[in-house]
Design a protein with these regions (language model features):
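Active-site residues of response regulator receiver
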Residues: 11, 55
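Helix N-cap/capping motif at the beta->alpha junctions
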Residues: 33-42, 63
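Active-site beta3 strand of CheY-like receiver
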Residues: 47-53
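Alpha4 helix (beta4-alpha4-beta5 surface) of REC/receiver domains from two-component response regulators
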Residues: 65, 88-106, 112-113, 117
Length: 134
């Protein structure tokens, strides 16, 4: 029996968390949610995810701040991440900070089938963790 892929969803919108989590759980993924970036980082350390769906705009620490902190950890340097934003402008200053942080950028609203496809795409990008670096 194969272990299901672990997905972490970080978003301050409870409706988004519940909707995405339910859809991905029905697809057979093990889903964890976090309503803030700081809780999300704690989740990522305690139960390393195979992929992360991350909101851009959140209070205190935005998605880019989360990603910088995540990438500072050797074990998460290459964890596939999608930043999902309701901002329709690709020229958003927060998005310009993503240079070199290895993240997909997607725009809300997203249909459930798009969330599932995005998750599959992220999981296909997984790299094995080098045991010498962890």
């Amino acid at each position: 029996m194969t272990t299901p892929a672990r997905i972490l969803i970080v978003d301050d919108d409870e409706t988004v968390l519940q909707t995405f989590a339910k859809a991905l759980s029905l697809e057979g993924y093990e889903v964890r949610t976090a309503a803030s970036p700081l809780i999300g980082l704690q989740e990522a350390v305690e139960t390393p995810p195979d992929a992360i769906l991350l909101d851009l705009r959140m209070p205190f620490v935005n998605g880019v701040g989360f990603l910088y902190r995540l990438r500072a950890q050797v074990a998460h340097r290459h964890t596939p991440v999608a930043i999902i934003t309701g901002d329709s402008c690709i020229d958003d200053p927060a998005l310009s900070e993503l240079h070199g942080l290895e993240a997909e950028v997607c725009f809300k609203p997203m249909w459930i089938d798009e969330v599932v496809t995005l998750t599959r795409t992220l999981l296909a990008k997984r790299r094995p963790i080098d045991p010498l670096l962890s």
